[in-house]
């Protein structure tokens, strides 16, 4: 979507309802919320005694870690492509 038009939707993350606004489609925003919910539940299975705040922070750390690893892989692939040119 990303045409500058704002979309508003309600999502459920870890039993909490959130209204989010973005430039992507409602389906995309719901998918993102679902991934966050899944990640929180995955971490909670391994650490069932974490309070919600610590669980949220640990989830954010894990997601940013995954993002940074993908970004590094992307940069490596980009360099490899430039070397072949």
Swiss-Prot record:
Matches recorded under NCBIfam families: PRK14126.1
Organism, scientific name: Bacillus velezensis (strain DSM 23117 / BGSC 10A6 / LMG 26770 / FZB42)
Protein keywords: Cell cycle, Cell division, Coiled coil, Cytoplasm, Septation
InterPro entries per the UniProt record, alphabetical: Bac_CellDiv_Activator, Cell_div_ZapA-like, Cell_div_ZapA-like_sf, Cell_div_ZapA_firmicutes
Protein name: Cell division protein ZapA
Family: Belongs to the ZapA family. Type 2 subfamily.
Protein localization: Cytoplasm
Description of how the protein assembles with itself and partners: Homodimer. Interacts with FtsZ.
GO CC terms: cell division site; cell septum; cytosol; plasma membrane
Pfam families, A to Z: ZapA (PF05164)
HAMAP family found in the cross-reference section: ZapA_type2
